[in-house]
Amino acid sequence: LYELINQFLDELQYMEQRFDTVKHEQEEDSFYSIVLPYAEHIDALIADLKTYQNVITQKVNYFNESKFSLLISNLQDLSVECHFARTSRKLFNEKLKAVRYDLNQIKRNGECND
């Protein structure tokens, strides 16, 4: 789980960089050649994360089922939104911050070091 969380944190960094590039250039990525494969990559990581759902919701303080679902939803949203210039910077950054906080909370408090 620890490695998976680190992988998600790396992906968040990529999403943030991709979003900044797309916003700066005002040129959106191709949906079928870039966005869809990347979203599928993130979905595969999410499927791995879901196998740890019970461990996370039981071991991490204040991390219940609804917070876990919101984390998943935000990860899915960010994986697509980072490729589009029309995405609101404020909303994107709020989701990014929330996801980064949640992942770090799992990493710190989860006692899940494989």
Mark where each language-model region is:
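Short terminal alpha-helical segments
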Residues: 1-32, 96, 103
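Amphipathic alpha-helical binding modules
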Residues: 73-114
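Residue-level recognition of alpha-helical structural elements
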Residues: 1, 27, 31, 60, ...
